[in-house]
């Protein structure tokens, strides 16, 4: 689905004088492969390069060196960009910068009109997109009247309506409250599980990545670590090296283990930890 090979992306950091201006590598020879239908998380501290990488997935940025292939089409070739941007949709941190319609329905239809989708098909896609994000009752609402979570769900509906194979959520939950974050992540998981859409989640919230098929850890423009949540979260010191923390429930499980409770690690979900504690209390679980 997506293959990144030896990707380098630099930007100019301007100083007070021309002599002080330097070139900074935001991405430094990145290699990555993402298969169709996977739920991928890309994590890292601020400035690690994760959002810069995300913008290469649908040709918003172009490689200085290396290649990004989307379904075997290179983002470096202008003729491929239209198809690539139909294949990979993006949702960004601030939905106000992405919503342009006077109503929710009008906003979702914008991309479909640009694709010249017939009216009957367009209406069907809008209906299915609204249903997928649980916003059917807000069809005629003014986006300005919506909550932050509802605006982000509207942006997701618009991105999904064009029938992409891949959806990139670039810090899409960063401005949301915990409840809205859970709703957005839940929708992403459903799109992945029920529709087979490849999800690429860019985030710094560790509790959002526990169900990912694979996690890539970015640090100073390189892929520093990669693996499943179980592989990466078994070692708290690994994430600490990159200024990241374990998910709260995983940290709690480690703390209980250190205090002598025979908790089996790593723990990903509160329900899982509660179940283990109940079994320990009943004497059904020991070290």
Report residues per predicted region.
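Catalytic Walker B motif of ABC-type/P-loop ATPase nucleotide-binding domains
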Residues: 167-170
